[in-house]
Structures are given as C-alpha cells and as structure tokens.
Curated annotation (Swiss-Prot):
Enzyme nomenclature, EC number: 2.7.11.1
Gene Ontology MF term list: ATP binding; protein kinase activity; protein serine kinase activity; protein serine/threonine kinase activity
Name of the protein in its database record: Nik-related protein kinase
Protein task: May phosphorylate cofilin-1 and induce actin polymerization through this process, during the late stages of embryogenesis. Involved in the TNF-alpha-induced signaling pathway.
Amino acid sequence: MAGPGGWRDREVTDLGHLPDPTGIFSLDKTIGLGTYGRIYLGLHEKTGAFTAVKVMNARKTPLPEIGRRVRVNKYQKSVGWRYSDEEEDLRTELNLLRKYSFHKNIVSFYGAFFKLSPPGQRHQLWMVMELCAAGSVTDVVRMTSNQSLKEDWIAYICREILQGLAHLHAHRVIHRDIKGQNVLLTHNAEVKLVDFGVSAQVSRTNGRRNSFIGTPYWMAPEVIDCDEDPRRSYDYRSDVWSVGITAIEMAEGAPPLCNLQPLEALFVILRESAPTVKSSGWSRKFHNFMEKCTIKNFLFRPTSANMLQHPFVRDIKNERHVVESLTRHLTGIIKKRQKKGIPLIFEREEAIKEQYTVRRFRGPSCTHELLRLPTSSRCRPLRVLHGEPSQPRWLPDREEPQVQALQQLQGAARVFMPLQALDSAPKPLKGQAQAPQRLQGAARVFMPLQAQVKAKASKPLQMQIKAPPRLRRAARVLMPLQAQVRAPRLLQVQSQVSKKQQAQTQTSEPQDLDQVPEEFQGQDQVPEQQRQGQAPEQQQRHNQVPEQELEQNQAPEQPEVQEQAAEPAQAETEAEEPESLRVNAQVFLPLLSQDHHVLLPLHLDTQVLIPVEGQTEGSPQAQAWTLEPPQAIGSVQALIEGLSRDLLRAPNSNNSKPLGPLQTLMENLSSNRFYSQPEQAREKKSKVSTLRQALAKRLSPKRFRAKSSWRPEKLELSDLEARRQRRQRRWEDIFNQHEEELRQVDKDKEDESSDNDEVFHSIQAEVQIEPLKPYISNPKKIEVQERSPSVPNNQDHAHHVKFSSSVPQRSLLEQAQKPIDIRQRSSQNRQNWLAASESSSEEESPVTGRRSQSSPPYSTIDQKLLVDIHVPDGFKVGKISPPVYLTNEWVGYNALSEIFRNDWLTPAPVIQPPEEDGDYVELYDASADTDGDDDDESNDTFEDTYDHANGNDDLDNQVDQANDVCKDHDDDNNKFVDDVNNNYYEAPSCPRASYGRDGSCKQDGYDGSRGKEEAYRGYGSHTANRSHGGSAASEDNAAIGDQEEHAANIGSERRGSEGDGGKGVVRTSEESGALGLNGEENCSETDGPGLKRPASQDFEYLQEEPGGGNEASNAIDSGAAPSAPDHESDNKDISESSTQSDFSANHSSPSKGSGMSADANFASAILYAGFVEVPEESPKQPSEVNVNPLYVSPACKKPLIHMYEKEFTSEICCGSLWGVNLLLGTRSNLYLMDRSGKADITKLIRRRPFRQIQVLEPLNLLITISGHKNRLRVYHLTWLRNKILNNDPESKRRQEEMLKTEEACKAIDKLTGCEHFSVLQHEETTYIAIALKSSIHLYAWAPKSFDESTAIKVCIDQSADSEGDYMSYQAYIRILAKIQAADPVNRFKRPDELLHLLKLKVFPTLDHKPVTVDLAIGSEKRLKIFFSSADGYHLIDAESEVMSDVTLPKNPLEIIIPQNIIILPDCLGIGMMLTFNAEALSVEANEQLFKKILEMWKDIPSSIAFECTQRTTGWGQKAIEVRSLQSRVLESELKRRSIKKLRFLCTRGDKLFFTSTLRNHHSRVYFMTLGKLEELQSNYDV
C-alpha cells in the first residue's frame, strides 16, 4: 500500500458498515492466534493469493432509547450501537492499521470485512493482512539450533523494528506490546510489526500514557510503575525498552526472568537493575545497545529515532550479505516445518492454546476500564479487562468446593508448617548438617516446593473443614512467595527434585499475563505451583505433604527458641491439625486475606530503618537489629503478639517503646537484611524484595484510614453518643457471630466468595485480635506492651473481635513533616472526634478509586495515620514511596472514606480516578517523587495564585450562631461541613458519563468540528478560546456572588455543619446506605484542594416552568429555606450549604448543631449526577483537583458548574486547552493549570499580558496576541513543555537563549494592534486570519513546496476530494506522510520544520473596525473571511477580495454589539451563527439568510459558546442561559446571586470553561458540564 489518503483517513466507527467477505476471501487452516482472535490462512478467490485473516467475534448491542441511525455530515452514522470493550479494541486496531500500515515495517493491511452470522451467533470481523510465511521472531529463535540468532541478524531485525516504531511514534502511537511474537518475518527477511490491539494514542500535551498494559517480561519499568503509582506516566520510549528485551530474547532464546512467574517478574523488573545478556561472547556495540534501550529512567532513555543512529544498527557491515544469509535461514525453517508436517504457524501449538485462554491484563488505571468492573471485584489491584477468560496455566482446573477447600488448606499448611516443625523436630537431618546456616533458615521460612513433590503421603490433614475461609486466602497469597524459593543455591534442601522437573522449571516459556493471579482476584482457586510440564499426579502429590517430611526439613538452631515457642500441652498432639496454622492465622489472616483488613501503621510503608553512614554490620547497634535465621523465624512467630500489642495497641499511650516485632521484621525486609550474612544480600535481593512487595500489598492499608476519636469514658453520654455506643455493640455482636459462620467450610462454595465477607467491609471499627497462645518473648528482649490478655487455645480457634475508640499517637514522621501536613494536631490543642462506627448496608461496592497524578509522594500524607515508632541509636529514618491510598492526592480519600474518620476498618467508596479523554498528563519532573521534603508552597510560580483563606472569621461566626455550634477557635480559621441527607432521594448510582472525545466545537476559528464533525471523529484535543468583543469586551459584566449573601444562606435551619470540614459531599442513596447515614447524624468531612465546590452556591438552577420557579428563586436569594416538599425539589433552585472558609489545620472539635440534614433542594439538584466530588483544600499545598469523576445520569439535562479553588490576582483574559491541561492568559502572565490530577498552577511566561491564545498541537505551536502592543506571537509547545519539566540551570540558560534567538518565540511580521485572530486547518494548509484596526491579514502555514498563489487556491483544488473533511489531525497525518515520503531526510522532522509561513493577502476593511474574525469554506468551495464590527457582520472572499455585508434584521434605533461568529459543525463549514445584542441568527457563507431570528436571550450576553450537543450557552449579566439549537427553547438558566464578570474561555465536548472576575479584580476558573450527547440525541434530531 503506497501511502495514506482516501479510505485510510476515514475512521471506522460502525463495524456493521464493513462489506461482507463472502465471495472475496475464503478461510483455510488456522496458522496462529492474535490478542482477540484466531489467524487463518486466507485465500483471495479471484487471484489465488494467500493472505493472513484475523477473525474475531464482534457483536453490536442496540440501546433501546436511541437505537436508530441519523445523518451526520453527509455520512450515515450509527448512534444507537454500543460496542463492548473487546470490540472497541478491535476498532482501535483496525483504524490504526488502516492509517499506518503503509510503512514497510508495519504489516500490510488489505481491508476489513464484517461477516454476518445466523441469529443466536456472534458476527465475525475479518481483518485481512499480509502473510508472513516465516512466522514470528520467537518461532525463528526456537527453530534455530542453539536458540540464538547471529549478532548481525539481531542488528538487522532491531533496526527494522526501530524503523517501524519510529513511524508509529511520529504519529503519536505507542505500540505497547513489542515482543518476539509480535515481530513477524516474511520469506525474504522483511520485518513486520503486528498486533495493534493494545496500541494507543498518547496524550496531546506531552505524549504520555499511564495505563497498565503489555506482556510482563517485555514490560518497561515505568509501565509497571503506573499500576502501583498512577501519578506516574510513560511515553513512547517504553517501546524502546521492549526492543532491548526482544534483542535479549533473540540472543538467548527467551526474555530475562522468564523462569519467574509473571507477577514475580513485574516486581523484579521494577526493583532490580536493568537486564543484560549473560554470555560474554557479544560485541561491545551490542552490550551498549542493550544498555541504552534498558535505561530504567525513561526520561533518559533514547527515542526510537535516536536509537536508529546507534552504531549497532546503523553500521551493519555487508548488509546485503546479512539479509541473504537470514533469508536462507528462514527458507530452511519453512522447509523444515513442511518436512515435519508442522503447519505454518506464528507460534507453537502450546502457545496458541495457552494464549487463547490467557490474555493480557490491564490494571485499573484507565477510568473506562474501572467503570465496567463487577461489584464482586473489590480491592483487586489487577483485573481482567475482557470478560472472564479461562483459567491461566498456573491455576488448576476448578474442582468440587470440598476438594478445592481441602487443597487450599493443605497449601496453607505447607506455608506455616516450618514454624510448627520447630517445636517437634528433635534433631536436624543428616543430609543437611553441612548446609550453611542461611540455607537452613531459608528452608524454615520458605518451604521449598520441590522438596514436597516427591514426599511420601502419610496422612492428609484433618483440620481443613474447620478452618475459616480466610485461611485459604492466606494460603493463596503466600503460595507465589513459596514458589520463588526454587533457586539453584537451595539444591541441598531440594535433593528430592528430579532433573526433569528442574529443566521444566527453567525452560518454562514466557507468557502473557493475561489473567490476574488468583490472590489478587479473590477468586476461589488454588495457585498451581508446578509449571506446565508437570503431571497431574505430581500436582496431587504436591497437595499432600506428610508430617515427617516437614519435620525433617526443619532443623532447629537454638534450643531456647524452641522452648519459647513450644506449647506445653498441645505442641506434640496437633500434628494432624498443625498448631502453627491456628497461631499464624492470627498474624497472616488480617494481613494477607483479601476480605479481612486490619490497619497497619503508615510508617511500615513510608519509613524504613537504614543504618547511618559509617555503621557496619559488625557494629553493636547494627548487630542488635540484625536477625539471625532463627530470630527471623521468631520474628515471624512474634507477629502473633505484634498485631495485638503493637499494631492495635491503644494509640493514646504516650510512652515511647522499642520497635515491635512486626516493625523489626519489616525493617529487615525493607533493608534487605533478612539474614545476617552480608555477602548473600545481593543473591537474596530479588526474593526478599518480592516478599516485601507482596507483604506491602497486603499490609498496606489502601482502603482504610486510622481515625482518632474520643475515649468513651471521657464523654458525657448524650443521646447521640448512647446511640452510637449501642450501634457499636450491635456491630460487635454481628461481627463475632459472622466470624463463627465463616468457619463453616462444608457449606456451598459461595461461602468462600466475597458475599460471605460483606460484613468485613461494612463494619467500621478498630479490630483487636486476641492471641490464642501465650506470647513468645523476643530473642533480643524487645519489649512489647501488653494490651489484650492471652487466651488459651480452644477447639474452634475463634478470633474474638472487640470494638473500641482510641486516639492515635503523633509519630516521628508527623513531627518531621509538620509544615506539610495540613491536619496534624498540635500536642497542646489536640482535639478528639466522635466515633462514627456505623453501617447500614451489606452491599459491597467495588474499590475503583485510584490516586491522581503529578504530586510528590510526601506532599499531603495524612499524619494522623502514623503510630509511634522508636528509632534506635545508629539508625536514621529513611523514606520510600508511601501507599497511594494513604495520601490525600488519592481521589477517594477526599470524599466518602473521610466519613469514617473515627474508624480503623473503613469500606472504600466508589470513586473514579481523574480522566480527561483517556489521557493522563504528568507535568512534573519524575525526580521530584524521591524528594522527601517537598514543601510545595515554596514555589515562586504561584505568585498570582493563592488559596482562598482570607476573611472567613465573620463568616464562621455567622455559621456558629446559625447552627448553635460550640467551637473552640484557634489560630487558623475553622471550617464546617454540610452533610447532605440523601435518604429522601432514591436516585440510583449511575455510571460515569463517557464524554471523552465526543467532540469539540470550533472556537476562534480553529476547527474542532467543521465539515465531518469532530464530535464523531474521535479527536477531541483541538481546543481554543475566543476573546469576545475587543479590549473591553467584558468590562461591563457583572460578578457572581458575594460572601455576605452567601453566608446568610449558610445559616438556614435546614443545613447542618460540623467543625472539621470544608465543603459538603453529596452521595447517592445507595452510597449513603452503605455509609450508614441517617437524618440524625452529621459526619465530619475534610475535603481536598482543587475544585472548591460544585459552585452551586454561586449559581442557582432555574428550570422553565409555568409558575413556581421564580418564587423559589426569591426564597433562596432572601436566605429563607423553601418550604416545598422534597419531591418537588427538582423544580426548585439549588444552593449549596457549605462555606468557603478553610478548616483548621491544628485541631477539630465536635459540633452540637441541631440541623443535621442539608438543603434538600441542593441535594436533589446535584444528585442527578450520581456523585459530585469536592476534594480537600489546603493552605499549605498546591490544589489537587478532581474535575472528571462525574457520574451523569442518562436522564439528566441540568448543567453542573464546578469551580477551581485557585484564585488569580489578575483578570483572566483568555484560555485554551493543551491536552487535558488548561493554558490561561492573564493581564500579566501565562499560566498552565494541571488538570490531570492536581490544580497546580505553573507560570510559563512572566510580565506580559495575553489577550488571546490558541494551541495548535499538530503544528507544535501556541498562537497568542500578547504584549502591551498586542503583537501576534507564536511560541513552540516543545519549549513550553521543557520549561515545565526541566528546571536545572543549564536547561534554563538554554531556554533563555532560545527566547533571544526567536527559536522559542517569534513575532509574525511584527504586527501590532492585533484585535483578534482565527485559525482554520484544511488539508495540508493551516490558515490564520488576523484582525487589525483597519485591515485583515491572511497567513498560511503550508508545505515548503507551496507558494502564495498555490496556498490561496489549495482549498479550491482539493475540497472536492475531501468532502468537507477539515479534521486537523488528518491534515497533520497527510503533512507527515506526503512530505516525509518525498524526502527521507524529513522523516523525523517536526511538522513545524516541514512548513513555512506564507503571507497571503491583506484585506482593507474600509470604514469598518474589525472586532472578531473567522474563517470558513463557502458553498462555492472558496475560502471566506467573516468579521464583525460595530456596523454588523461582513464577508470577504479570499480569492477575489470582494467584501459584502451580511444581512441583519433592520432596526435603525439599535446599536449592534457583536459577540461571536460560530461555525455550525453540522453544516459542512457553510453555516454560521452570528450573535449580536440579545439575538442570534444563522446564515450561510454564500450570503443567503436561511433562518430568521434563532434565539432571543433574556439579557445581552457577554460571550456565547456553541458545543457539540447542539446547544448554545450565553453568559449574560444576570444568568447563564443554555438553549437548544434545534428546539430554540431555553433549556436551563443559572442565576447568579451577585454581579460578576463572566468570560467564556474554551470548550471540549460538553465541558465549557469560563472565568469570572471578582470585585477585587481577582479571577477564578469554572467549568460547566451540560450533559451527555446520547441523551440529547434521544430527545432532539441531531
């Protein structure tokens, strides 16, 4: 296929429109398997040519309410079909192949077909591609004699791979699954990349993604890190890492770490050094090539284009000879297959079978993946995306529940048996007498697997039926850890393992991690520890371990440890029911089970004890804290008491104590000193780090918070407190009763599922697990405070649970980070909170919350979670990354989970991570994550921003008086929270609206949706702003609201407030039930920075109705609560009841207000969205914003307004979206607001006013009207991005030099006095019209082969072929493809380097002074220039230079105030909507008036916007009006309480961004969501 163009550029949006393959292609035998379907040998029936046909199931499901077809942009487009996740990936792969397969290193794509099947069967999608007869690189390596390719062949293949990747990366596509199986070879040694099922377009801001996807062994560290830390991101350089791993695969026959389980490999890749080839027979160039490819920090890793210049792939000697020799080798492989009768396959038959059941997995980093998770998938860090595939090969087949439970308990017995064997083994085994001490210690702690395979089955364990289900989960969690211990250095312990089994273990081939291992899924399956080659009988023997073998394998080292660990009466008699199962269950069940969670102090995850410099292993301090192997076992066994004494001890005890046993164990694990021999530290590093990671996964209190509360004995028992205590006792009884029920294993298998453990998630209280055996004193005499009495062993081994309230202690880390923590309590003014441990629902909700990005890990740690630790002499406190769910950057922490401030056990809420069009953008240096003392306030980029924390004392006093709240004022302003009572509203919890790339309209003349509307083309990142009306366009506009009137409304009797809050959080009735809210209780909320509130306190919603609406509005405005019943609240105004005041950073106090429920009208108005999240604000840290998690109901039509908390000290004049982030131009600076997760404000350009800005991402340009002379300046986006990311002095110096030499910024023709500009992208040319005081200048960025005369006519010459396609991204593709194909030197140049700026024409405007200008293609396919003036609207033909006036309604007494020229996206670029005064009309570009007055605004709007859902929005003096373009009716009106200036900035999809100017000339940014496109299409004929 020669190149792009024509059908390639039209994106496939409806699979049903593809042709039928019958009569064109026929299928032969199966030759391979792709990600989602089989690959067949296809035969073109007319020519007899062979092809590869990928056949996949595809089904379309009609939505009943909008299951119809409509006409959009001349094309029939289905709006009534919704595709599944798998089918969306198929469409992605199909469109990527259509666009980019013209490259010689991408498999050629011949077409796609849709084969209809009979009713009841799924239809089939056929993708016909080039046949690569030699198979994949993996197959070629396996068919080679020594399973290794020659170095020259590797260099050639790597070069071809890099060329294909450079082609994809130039088009902003990340492959994300480069491996040997996805690199195919033809019979003549051509290299082709295949399998684009997981490829993705990168972010438009800085080209990054953060979804967790790929094949584990080839996965780059930054991709793995995105699963553990979604604040991270990666870019196309992750493919370069995969190329390096593929090179190792070609050199050694398998990728590194292929002998590990996939999850283990993920841990090792992220934490170990970069892999390399083991053999030393390779050249230095090859080693250097792999080192460059596998640089762990992707910011320093070369790109694919740079790697092509590496000598290893650039200087291939005798390339022709290399290709010929490789061709001969491939021909021999093909003939060898034919001789052996092996069919032409791309992968081995076993791999086909495995990959058919084992598919890729994805972590929940992408919001659209999280939304589809079932409710039973609670707290799974990794999930299967596509359906429920068959079990992977490391899991056995499902068996009967009784048999499976038996195997699970036997697995648990093997895990904990080493400790039991210590009590009963009389002497060490003779064969192990010579074994080093470390091997014996390892054998005790991790029972080797192979030692059990040949073990003689003596008597099966008898206690499995009586053990609680959590024990089986503990066994499943620890099984992979047990599998890790298979290593060559334990051969003396593993003498029973046959060489055949070892060979099978070593040669187990790599696999896609297509399904999550069982311990992360919570499914009731036993992890299969044997590799795929083992026989079923060996697996059966593996599940039954005799007690004698266990005793023989455990050699006691110190008798005193045995004596301390022995049970007086039961140690010898419990061989059948090992006591270690019961005892250690107390330790590992709370830590490791999936459904039973006990809080671990934060310092175990955020601090490790590291020996101070100069401290050696031999020093007394270090020796005192270094465990010998028996002591390590003792520490594990000491975890029993450690939980009850250390972790769950009363946090209000003020005496400091030595490090507890669990802290000691974690300290040793964290410092990689589990054994005392320092020379073995490197060898054990991977295993210990893997163990540490697995423990941290289970120990990390991701979904829970430690909350402080009053001691009950210190309180007077009021009615509310008495109710709470009764509820507490009731839940204690339920908890213990449910504990007894859980231990009945003989019930149905469903007892093992999460349904049986719902109470564990719904109970909020501190759990105290009482030990069932006396505490074994620590060998090093580490003192541990006794908290709960020891209980002798009983037959049932019940874990009794007590509920108590306690006050956590300040920790060392809390004191160290005092300036950073915003809620830490001073020791003098420590306040306590009331316990609120109640729950009224047993319904589980999936934990889908993820943390937001771009935040240093220690910026907002909740210090209340920390428990005191004692740091011994000679140690310092080191830091590692904290768990995400313990930081306030996590979205979920700012909302529902905060209601459980007083609880240790807290169910996590249903909260989605921030997402903007599926792309995450990270705008901070990755090295900032490692800084431990990040005080984000010390950043001079926030000069014009500050947190709104002023002048709230009076407001607080008013709230205190209105609510009768007894409050203890401190230095800081205290905050209150309104608790919204949702029991009256039965709105279901709705899934989040998938706005994404539904479209963006044209602003500023920059086309987002001309011609073929961008709303339906999937490219939604073209955004721009329009500055309306001239230099004083919005000077007379009014402001939004004032604190005095607002405070009066807050004091209404129907609102409740509480002391330690910020803004109220609204929940659905389902979520409220899960949290146990009722009308008698008010719960404290602490909200995060970012969106200060849904801004409903400034805007009131008015729905047009015959009467009643205005009265309700007046009632709200006057501060009186409306008396309408609750069911009428949807027809009333909305007003928020929360305050603007900051909450206290040092203390909190309970409130005794009588108004417990918030305004019902406000709740009703917001509840349609399902959930509106108001994160927490902080005066100490940059704001964290969560703008996207809106769950919009399909029935909702009311707009939502959200406000960003940051205020700007100068007026915001313009804005434009750059990717997901917002560029804001003020009267003094240019800022970037990071909307990806935190509302960080970065100052990009100082001391220069900006009047209008617009981002042109395809051209890598930012066009501005800026400066005091209103010059037209063009900035390079690359320079701005480097200004954000690179803060080192050398980079800053380089940036200043670029600015001086006009490499970063250039003034176009030194034009001054610019009023407005507009951009139109069409084909290869980008036009820009600039309005000056008396003329309009027309410029164009065109290919360097164009001149002025060609550029002005290119529209006419090519419009007939384009059929109205003005998609700028398609033009960008054409620019690259055509210009780069013409000259290979241009292959990797940026688009702006391939174009030149042409000055086309200057059009005098005679006596008309232009105010706004716009560009369009007229009905005669000619370029038209619209501009407005005080005299009306005018039209200029660009080619003939003829100017004419647009007909307006004649009213000689009226002065025309022009606002906007809006290109209507559904009119193929011909239709215009002209807005002026309080009217709007639509005209065609051929001067014909085809509609009369379209709309009549109630007031003259300052600015008007048109968005993709066919609605116009006007910002007037008194209200914001939303009108339908089709029905011409006023859909909604949001009134403002006081006058503020409003100015429209930009739009994306149905999100409209605008700004308001406050009375003190400060500005604030809002965005408004109007509703879903599908809902409007069901109501209007779009």
